[in-house]
Amino acid sequence: TENGTIGCHKTAGGHRKFTMQNVRDYYKVNKKASKSDEIALENFEHKKIYELIKKNNFSELAHKLANASIESDESTVKTIISGSYMNNIDVETLFDKIVDPGSMIVEKALHENYLSHTEAFISRKIITRASESLNDNKPNGSYNGKSALCVNFEDNLPDLGVVMSEVILRHKGYNVYNTGSHAELGDLKKVIDNKKIDLIVFYLCNMQCCMSVVGDNITKTADMVASIYETASKLKVEVIFGGLGIELLPDISKTIKKTFIT
């Protein structure tokens, strides 16, 4: 607002546009406001989730996230993710302690035949959509210093890992371009030049619904990584490889030095 209470963006027509980031920043400065039960209960679906968030009970939140996604309860999934974000849990902690563990609980249910492949995919898609909404608070723009390309492999169906990478990079000040699933990168040099890419992030999971790590596809995936890395190296673009799928590509770690598991 104009008196500086909560930051906002004013449009040419004079309208004020707020994002979750604006409100989040306000709560950072005004601790008493963030502790108000009235405000919390207005923004979060019920008191139990609010209490878990305030106590940083990440394990319980991860289980609630998994259960809500399995039940296709999108409202609760959004409440857990957006509520944690609004209470100033940084995105790295949110993903490492709540979202990724919640997704792995869904994967375990699939392994134990509690869920079908379709049900697990629906569940993870709900979590992915809620996570991706955090990008709205950090849009791409000329004010960002660097640009990153997040690469999901052609046969890799779940987008959650690459979406989490995108959210974190945006919060680090990057413009981020996400290829999504089944993307054909085509002339990578042209993409890097046109978008002025400084960093490429690969993400490969090893879940049952990920076809990039099945049979002959694992060789195809390894060849694709090697090809992209070679092109990026020639153009002096930094490369990071993430996800549990890296354990299935042992030669990659010898080539790409910067890696992460989750």
Features from the language model and the residues they span:
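Polyanion-binding surface elements
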Residues: T1
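Glycine-centered, phosphate/nucleic-acid-interacting loop/turn motifs that mediate DNA/RNA or nucleotide
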Residues: G4
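Long amphipathic alpha-helical segments
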Residues: G7-H9, G13-P139
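C-terminal regulatory/effector modules of DNA-binding transcriptional regulators
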Residues: N113-S116, I122, I126-T262
